[in-house]
């Protein structure tokens, strides 16, 4: 659970950061930014076979209700301002997961004049999931890595 110590009389000693980060890891609410074939694998992860709900990950329709953005697919120059706008609307603290070779670094279309060579050029990315397209298992592993990163966060308010 991440609680440092439990005393004999039922008292728990911990920090506010540990409790808040524990709650944040169990309630990630992603907004999807599916741009290409990686979005199909993201949908697979949310369906019955993998069921992201058991990790507390529930997809939200609005960025104002979400704290995680999953960028899945090829990001073009024309779509980059929209990506930034959605990122700015996310609730604080917010995280970004880049899914697939195209979102990570341009992928197959890296040398095209219209492709952004990585989502990290537009928004700060916390976790990269490699693959073309990555499997649903790889996405779940990336989400678990993000949960571990959130647990290690030492401040209540995250600096940009």
Curated annotation (Swiss-Prot):
GO terms for molecular function: 4 iron, 4 sulfur cluster binding; iron ion binding; NADH dehydrogenase (ubiquinone) activity; NADH:ubiquinone reductase (non-electrogenic) activity; quinone binding. It is a peripheral membrane protein. The keyword Protein transport does not apply. Its main location: membrane. GO terms for biological process: aerobic respiration; electron transport coupled proton transport. Pfam families: Oxidored_q6. It is an enzyme of class 7 (translocase). [4Fe-4S] cluster binds at residues 37-38, 102, 132. Keywords: 4Fe-4S, Cell inner membrane, Cell membrane, Iron, Iron-sulfur, Membrane, Metal-binding, NAD, Quinone, Translocase, Transport, Ubiquinone. The keyword Plastid does not apply. It comes from the Bacteria. One of its GO terms (cellular component) is respiratory chain complex I. It catalyses: a quinone + NADH + 5 H(+)(in) = a quinol + NAD(+) + 4 H(+)(out). Binds 1 [4Fe-4S] cluster. InterPro entries: NADH_UbQ_OxRdtase-like_20kDa, NADH_UQ_OxRdtase_20Kd_su. It is found in: Cell inner membrane. Its EC number is 7.1.1.-. Its cofactor is [4Fe-4S] cluster. Belongs to the complex I 20 kDa subunit family. NCBIfam families: nuoB_fam, PRK06411.1. HAMAP family: NDH1_NuoB. NDH-1 shuttles electrons from NADH, via FMN and iron-sulfur (Fe-S) centers, to quinones in the respiratory chain. Couples the redox reaction to proton translocation (for every two electrons transferred, four hydrogen ions are translocated across the cytoplasmic membrane), and thus conserves the redox energy in a proton gradient. This is NADH-quinone oxidoreductase subunit B. The gene is nuoB.
